[in-house]
Amino acid sequence: MPGLVENLKDLHALVHELDDTRMTTMAQVSNLPMENEQNDITDVVSYNHYFGWYGGKLEDNEAWLDAFHEMHPERPIGISEYGCEGITTYHNDNPKGGDYSEEFQAVYHEHMAKIIEERPWLWATHVWNMF
């Protein structure tokens, strides 16, 4: 998109002009490449990822985070959205992605809690829950 990067840089500069104590961030969509120049504009960056729910598998979360951290070891990275849907009346003794069961929802969030805890360099994480 022509002008997008310049606009983002202008907004970042304006924030710091108005309040130099305030950090800037941006939530990137999952398919934006790690090496995209947008990732270098704000003070910190986050990605919306739903690996293991809308596509891919649960283990893609840690693989992606570790690859981003390896590529940008000094760049603060966060997860601006993650999660999966569950329906209170759906249950499954063998939960799997896409079944909407409460059991898979528990598996998903327990997995995410573990990988988040193991990566102290994550600056923020946000479960998507309709906010």
Q: For each of these PLM feature ranges, what is it?
A:
Residues M1:
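Active-site neighborhood of divalent metal-dependent phosphoester/pyrophosphate hydrolases
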Residues V5-V29, M34-F131:
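Substrate-binding clefts and catalytic carboxylate motifs of secreted carbohydrate-active enzymes
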